[in-house]
Every structure is written in C-alpha cells, then in structure tokens.
Amino acid sequence: TVYFLARDGYNLYQIFKHQGFANVEYLYTSRRALTLACIQEMDEEEMDTLPPYSTGQTVGEVLDYLCIDRNRITHLEEAGFHSFDEVLETETDMEAFKKLYVLDREVFLERCRRERENALAYFHGTGLLDRDGICFDCGWQGSSQWLLERFKKAVGCRTKHPFVYFAIKDGEKSRTQLHGMHYETWLFDFYKNYGLQNNINQNVVMYELFFSAPHESVFYYGDGGTVIFEEGEGDPRRQELLEGIADYIREGHSFVEKYEVETTPEISVGPLNRLIHRPTEEEAVAIGNLQNV
C-alpha cells in the first residue's frame, strides 16, 4: 500500500485513484497531530519537540495549541509567568515555558496519552500499523517520517514504511531527522542533484503549489480516531487550481504512456524554472494575480 500524506500527497493520491490503483490511501496527518502522540516522558529531549517554536505568542496561545485547559495549569508563576496573556518575547521566555512542562508534567502527559490513543485508533483504521507500505511526502526536512517513526515506536508498531520524497533540503535538521531512515528522493537530496537545491530554495512557494490540498491542516485526532482539522473553510481558488493541475496530468498521461516518454528531474522542472525566471508578459500578469494558496 502507498500512503500519500496530507496535505502534500493530495494531488498524487487523486491522480493514482483516478488511474484505478487500488492499493493507495490518503493519510490525514500533520506534524501537530503526531507531536504529542509521540511523547511518553517529559524529559529534555521530548520538550525540545514541543512549542513554543518561535517568539511572539502568548503563554495562553501555546497552551491552546496543545489543547491544554488553562484552569488545570497550577504552576504558572513558579515557571516565571504572571498571566496567560504574557507574550513570549525572548529565547529566555521560551526556555521558561519548559519549566511549565516540568511543573505541570502530569497535565501535559495526560493530553499526550489521550492524543496517542486517538491517533492509534485512526492509524489502525488505515491499516498502516498492520502492514508494510510506502509513504509519500513532499519533504524538505523529513519531519513527518521522523514523527511517524517516533509514534510507531511509542505504540510498539514494527511495520516498515520507507518514504519517497519530492526533495530533501540539506541542513542540520533534515540530516538529524533522517539519520538512519530509509527513504528515496525524486529531485534532490544531500548527495543527489545538489546543484538544483539553491534554485528550488529561492522559489519554494511555487513548487509547493503542486503539493497543497483544498482542506485545512489536521489539528489532532479526536475520540475514536476522528480527524479534527484546524479552523477554516478551505479556499475555492485553491480547489480550482488543484483540479487544473490534476486535469493537466491526466490528459498528458496517455501520451507519456503511449510513447514511453522518460525524462530527467532537471528537464522536468525546466519549464517551471523558465516560468519563474523568464515569464512572458501575459504569464507575469497571471502569476501576479494569483492569491497566496
């Protein structure tokens, strides 16, 4: 079975399903949905995976993101905060939040256990925990694979799921997360087609259009494994754009199959690079009118 991870795998899943492949599944998941489900102890290593990830949020906003009832937090002042409205403005403030994880450890671990149980129910329903398979993700840093393997370890799952990525960027985070992992990339990674990486990095938003979905990101798994999405109603323009991408690929598939067309990654991304760097006047206007999807 090939599992296409939300939201990056939405387009490819629709195309594979349209082509009649039976062994494909769309996996509703996200980094947020897996992060808490992985945690069994509140040690330094685990706390490093938890928010806050950047300054600017209030203490209360971080707790809301984690679905923690503020009324159950009893050590706010001991951690160095005066109110839930206090803004985390510095690295020191972010470190202070870790004290809250320690002081109110059981409150956080209870939420982690609940999210793990609900995630377990969802993944059992997909069959992923019961059989080997392959997962597709757009990639860049390998976070989903790293989290999925952590979750599988937490629930005692031994099935194997190597990943296939569009590309993996070279960086400390990706090298750390993918160390010892089994994966393949199509476009580039640490060792393959390295010269393409700089060009992609400068225009990553355009490429990510191909790996988006009309639904919101998964927030967490509710009781019984129900999928809870982040607030939002989707975007009709995004839906229209994704349908156009899918239709274009479907129409071209018969030609590619009939004439056994093969191409290299470098040649494949050439037209998009031309569109980005040397658009015609008409194309430039059309791109300029695109909303950020």
Language-model segment annotations:
Residues T1-V293:
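Long, low-complexity, Lys/Arg-enriched
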